[in-house]
Amino acid sequence: MTIKLINIGFGNIVSANRIISIVSPESAPIKRIMQEARDRNMLIDATYGRRTRAVIVTDSDHVILSAVQPETVAQRLHTKEDGVEDA
C-alpha cells in the first residue's frame, strides 16, 4: 500500500488514504462536527487565519480545516488517484 499525499493549502499535506469526506463548512451539522472535534482536541486548523472553505473528515476522527475550496481539494485527490501529478 502506497501513501498518497494531498496538498490542502499553504504547504499543508494530508494522507489521501485517510480522507473520508471533504465538505463545505456552511451547514449546521458540519459546524456541530467542527465544535465537537474542537472539544475533543481532534480539530486541526490548517487555514493560517483565513476563512475556512473546506472541512476534511478522516478515518481517525480528526477534522481538518482548510482555506481552499472543497472542489479544489477533491480535484487534487482525483488527480492523485489517477496517477497524474500536479503542475
Swiss-Prot record:
InterPro entries in the record: RemA-like
Family designation: Belongs to the RemA family.
Matching HAMAP family: RemA
Protein name stated in the entry: Putative regulatory protein ABC2323
Species of provenance: Shouchella clausii (strain KSM-K16)
